[in-house]
């Protein structure tokens, strides 16, 4: 059995021996993306599992060990991990936990310390916690993020973004209910099989997969009747995690809406952009600057490959590239606003409005200052740019009830339906007017 080793400041390390013996548990956020990430790490030699437990026990365990005024995502992530350790499914003497650390000023950078504190209180002080980060915040002898691993993660991000995007655009209109979701599951299985054989992550294989995904989704029979189109933005965990947002996408689908959720690639490029800015402004190694620049260029090329595949299909709404999002906030919010989701959150709302998704749910953990500034705080400015924007901020925390959240969203949808009906009526009137003008011209031509 692996020996427990600690750093000078008392942090329990994840050692090379543990890599051979331990199972690593990871909290879930994006179901499709994380299945692909799971395979990437398993292929790299880690016995890793993405958690799927989502009962109310997760919240209860979180409340036991995390103060209820702490960031709601922290409470859920920690609750999910402790609930898993309590389940009896895992040998807790051979289990490690993994959590991401962005290294920014958001409270998310402190989740790892809150998790260690909670583990000690719950009697799991001997469970090591691995920080997944590119900032050099914490290192472990038994875990390393290699350039090859990063590139494979990027491929997973692009595939996940594309499947999420196309599923949302097709399932709202599909004639055979469930066909779009079945295609997502089919592609996840195909990609997992390719990943296990080191295929589909780069080059021609990657581009061919993107083309095939777009082709197959476009082949699903649909009836494109006018529907309310709703964008979902917000704090990254609450925006994406069905556990955190009370299955928001499912609720919007039940209200007969088409949903658009901006992908993870935008956030990835946003973080790289910030790192480059910080090195220029505050100093840093030239090697790190070159590596981040290379990585950003690589991500941009992968993003472009996805957008190119989508542009071949006029039936799909193609999201804007990150470079365009960056230009949208000029005169609205400064680039120095980069805590949490920062100016990207504002940019995503502007881009959604520009793309025809003027009805927006802004998901925010209660008390999340960056989210309130860049999300709720920007609604007024966004309305000046897009007067028809219909944005509702929704707070999520342990005491917020699903009924209240859904009632607020229903009020927003009521306004959205009124706007849609007015638009349809105006289009019909314009069409009738044109037809009338054509009819009047016919006798004149005949003479």
Language-model regions: role of each:
Residues 1-447:
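An N-terminal assembly and electron-transfer interface module characteristic of large anaerobic redox
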